[in-house]
Amino acid sequence: MSENKGDGGKLLYCSFCGKSQHEVRKLIAGPSVYVCDECVELCNDIIREEIKEISPKQDQDKLPTPHELRAHLDDYVIGQDKAKKVLSVAVYNHYKRLKNASPKDGVELGKSNILLIGPTGSGKTLLAETLARFLNVPFTMADATTLTEAGYVGEDVENIIQKLLQKCDYDVEKAQRGIVYIDEIDKISRKSDNPSITRDVSGEGVQQALLKLIEGTVAAVPPQGGRKHPQQEFLQVDTSKILFVCGGAFAGLEKVIEQRSHVGTGIGFGAEVKGEADKATISDTLLQVEPEDLVKFGLIPEFIGRLPVLATLAELDDAALIQILSEPKNAITKQFAALFEMEDVELEFREDALKAIALKAQTRKTGARGLRSIVEGILLDIMYDLPSTDDVVKVVVDESVVKGESTPILIYATNEAQTATAE
């Protein structure tokens, strides 16, 4: 930087930090005052922090109604109407309870933790994540299969709270308004109906460990992800304010329900499904689930009692998968179209291509979860070549591309110009 000086060659200094014009990149002059670029940046940081502190308080005053929550879910999640309604009411009641922590009549409101039952790829995680994003609250996921009781090899249940804190930069107040989704909860079912002499540290033991956390306790978490140490000060997190959503496929649960209600079908999510009638039967059977069925499946009564809100999700059919590919705000085809648009290229999926992708996902039995990997595979080669290819203005994917019988159709600017001239 050249040695610029003020009037009369006098060296100028920042009126706030005292640094000279040679120690900073820019010095802005005002009436009898100067401010450097570093002080301006510091002021911006302070203002941003203050806005962050104010925003959550403003958000707390504007609790969306169940209708508004449901409408937002409709924008991102296809189908599952009953589950959406159940979730919208439960989430609304949970945050209404936090907002009115001290009811005038002294009635203590219980927690509305949620249990979601449905096959892989039916939208359990997406529902919880979409609500958290809409409500602007921290969200974290945990896999129940990795959890063990404290003192055993594996992940301690309190690590879930640590992950939630990490999502909000260890702001305890924000974390206490967060949502935790615990997946594969059916995998920690009790291994047998009878208590075993051998300790079940990854099944019933984990259920016992999760009980207090889900119901509400003050969890002691090391700050900034440090290891637990006797002399270390812990962050105290009240989990009674955190909404817990547990989800699982519960393969075979319909057989337990059928035994109770004497309905003789007995086909599970894990088994081969042979027809639309069978699929409907499974979904209808799961709608009849009672707490006693979950106990027989392997969840302990105390654990079920901590999850009072129950919602079942149906297996997605071809029509739903096609909708998921193209209709939601963040639909997979829209995401890839946005990527191609960054290369100034239009991406088009023909209707027969969408049907073929849905059929492939059904064959793999991955539900909506497998759609992205299928589309990634279809577009891999073209995404590799496109940045090095000139003049391409449009890429078209049809059924033959999905089946691997041909490559995507490329339309070049010269072709379009020739077509326009011919017309």
Swiss-Prot record:
Entries under HAMAP family matching the protein: ClpX
Biological function: ATP-dependent specificity component of the Clp protease. It directs the protease to specific substrates. Can perform chaperone functions in the absence of ClpP.
Organism, as annotated: Shewanella piezotolerans (strain WP3 / JCM 13877)
Sequence ranges assigned to domain ClpX-type ZB in this UniProt record: 2-55
Gene3D superfamilies from the UniProt entry: 1.10.8.60, ClpX chaperone, C4-type zinc finger domain, P-loop containing nucleotide triphosphate hydrolases
Entries under InterPro entries matching the protein: AAA+_ATPase, ATP-dep_Clp_protease_ClpX, ATPase_AAA_core, Clp_ATPase_C, Clp_protease_ATP-bd_su_ClpX, ClpX_bact, P-loop_NTPase, Znf_CppX_C4
Residues at which Zn(2+) binds: C14, C17, C36, C39
Subunit description: Component of the ClpX-ClpP complex. Forms a hexameric ring that, in the presence of ATP, binds to fourteen ClpP subunits assembled into a disk-like structure with a central cavity, resembling the structure of eukaryotic proteasomes.
Alphabetized PANTHER family for the sequence: ATP-DEPENDENT CLP PROTEASE ATP-BINDING SUBUNIT CLPX-LIKE, MITOCHONDRIAL (PTHR48102:SF7), ATP-DEPENDENT CLP PROTEASE ATP-BINDING SUBUNIT CLPX-LIKE, MITOCHONDRIAL-RELATED (PTHR48102)
GO cellular component entries: HslUV protease complex
Family, as annotated: Belongs to the ClpX chaperone family.
Molecular function via GO: ATP binding; ATP hydrolysis activity; ATP-dependent protein folding chaperone; protein dimerization activity; unfolded protein binding; zinc ion binding
Coiled coil: none
Binding site for ATP: P119, T120, G121, S122, G123, K124, T125, L126
Alphabetical list of SUPFAM superfamilies matching this protein: Glucocorticoid receptor-like (DNA-binding domain), P-loop containing nucleoside triphosphate hydrolases
Superkingdom per UniProt: Bacteria
Name listed for the protein in its UniProt record: ATP-dependent Clp protease ATP-binding subunit ClpX
Keywords, sorted A to Z: ATP-binding, Chaperone, Metal-binding, Nucleotide-binding, Zinc
Gene Ontology terms describing biological process: cell division; proteolysis involved in protein catabolic process
